[in-house]
């Protein structure tokens, strides 16, 4: 993980446009390729971000031409591909970071002055251990996939992927694959996790097209907005009601 504290300005160019004026911020570049811009507030929420898969390219800026317009990338110096470990760090005082995803959306960060630039190898994270209620909720939904939608059937619980297991993999009434992320309280982090799973599973020709479903006892408004914006279905589930539903699994005793 690379952590850069710098004076910077940020422009997002995509379906919408957004601008952050020049200020001191934290730039976070993770090993998975994601880049996020943070201020000293908003808890864990970034001001702007780009999720993987995306590429980060660094362009040195001519210091003697501060008023140059860089919106088309034509007035910058030689560019170099930037690895997430920061190994290709340029010696120029000012830089233009262009972060671009597969859809062509860009996060353009003009770094005016670096205060700190540090890279850490955090290694592989073991991930979160679900609490008792959340783990049981996942188990109950796997037993009763119809609670997620009429006609839903279970493919597999804890479906393995290279980036971790999908909580539940199902098929809807029309036979389409649906990846389900289960949370006790659904927040933005859960939506981001589901996004990564869906993007990865859609590369599998057998499973594609894969849709996403975000299931939780409670879904925060911001998380619901983000999930629906990404085309995911949101389902609020009643844990107590599910606990009282007889299991359809065959039991010996």
From Swiss-Prot:
| Subcellular location as annotated | Cytoplasm
Record the organism.
Answer: Corynebacterium kroppenstedtii (strain DSM 44385 / JCM 11950 / CIP 105744 / CCUG 35717)
Q: Which domain of life is it from?
A: Bacteria
Which keywords, in A-to-Z order, does the entry hold? Answer: Cytoplasm, DNA-binding, Endonuclease, Hydrolase, Nuclease
Q: Name one GO molecular function term.
A: DNA binding
Q: Which GO terms describe its cellular component?
A: cytoplasm
The task this protein performs is described as: Cleaves both 3' and 5' ssDNA extremities of branched DNA structures.
List where Polar residues composition bias occurs. Answer: 71-87
What top-tier enzyme class does this entry carry? hydrolase
For the region Disordered, what residue ranges are annotated? 63-91
Question: What is the name of the protein in this document?
Answer: Endonuclease NucS
Pfam family example for this protein? NucS_N
State which Enzyme Commission number(s) the record gives. Answer: 3.1.-.-
Q: Which residues form the signal peptide?
A: none
Family designation: Belongs to the NucS endonuclease family.
Q: What is its main location?
A: cytoplasm
């Amino acid at each position: 993980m690379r952590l850069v504290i710098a004076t910077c300005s940020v422009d997002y160019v995509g379906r919408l446009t957004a601008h952050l004026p020049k200020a001191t911020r934290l730039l976070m570049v993770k090993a998975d390729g994601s880049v996020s811009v943070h201020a000293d507030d908003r808890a864990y929420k970034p001001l702007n971000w780009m999720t993987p898969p995306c590429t980060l390219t660094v362009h040195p800026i001519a210091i003697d031409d501060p008023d140059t317009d860089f919106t088309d990338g034509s007035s910058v110096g030689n560019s170099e591909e930037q690895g997430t470990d920061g190994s290709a760090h340029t010696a120029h005082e000012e830089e233009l970071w262009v972060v671009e995803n597969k859809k062509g959306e860009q996060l353009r960060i003009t770094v005016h002055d670096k205060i700190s630039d540090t890279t850490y190898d955090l290694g592989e994270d073991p991930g979160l251990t679900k609490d008792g209620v959340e783990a049981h909720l996942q188990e109950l939904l796997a037993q009763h996939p119809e609670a997620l939608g009429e006609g839903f059937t279970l493919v597999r619980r804890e479906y393995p992927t290279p980036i971790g297991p999908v909580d539940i993999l199902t098929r809807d009434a029309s036979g389409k694959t649906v990846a389900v992320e289960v949370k006790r309280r659904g927040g933005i982090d859960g939506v981001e996790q589901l996004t990564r799973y869906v993007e990865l599973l859609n590369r599998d020709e057998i499973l594609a097209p894969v849709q996403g479903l975000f299931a939780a006892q409670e879904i925060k408004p911001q998380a619901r907005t983000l999930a629906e914006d990404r085309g995911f279905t949101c389902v609020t589930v009643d844990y107590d009601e599910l606990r009282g539903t007889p299991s359809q699994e065959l039991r010996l005793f």
